[in-house]
Amino acid sequence: MKKVISTLMIVFAVTVFTGCQRNYTVYERHDITACGVKDPLVNVKWLADKCEEIKKGKAKEATISLLKDTVTQDNAFMIRYHYKQRGKDMYSGDGYDCSGKWLYGFRSGMMPFPPEEKEKFFKNKIGLGVIFKFSFK
C-alpha cells in the first residue's frame, strides 16, 4: 500500500510541475528601422518593456504591427490582444506613437470609443506588417 501511495504521489508531483508549463511561440522581427532607430523591439525602451510584459501576461495571442503615416512619415504601433474571459474570446487593441503615448484603443464587450478617435489614429497610415507576435499553442 505504501508503494502505491508513493507512486501516486510521484505521478501527481510530475503532473503538477510539468502540466503548469505553458507552450508558446514568439516571432520577433529585428531587421527593421522605425522611430529613428534600428531594431525598435530592442532599442525603443517602452516597446521592449511591452514585449516582455506580453510574454509574462495572460493573453492567448498578442501582435504588434508597425504603421507609417504616408504624409508625415512618422511611425506608430498597433498592439492587439486576443484572450479568453469567462470562456469567451475577447479582443482589444491599443495604438501608440513612437514615444509610447497611447493614441487609440478598443475593447470587446465595452462601449466603443468614438469613431473619430479611430479615424484620427488610422488617418493616412499604412500597415508595414507584424513585427512581434506571441501566442500560446
Task: Please place each PLM-identified region on the residue numbering.
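Bacterial signal peptide processing site
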Residues: 21-23
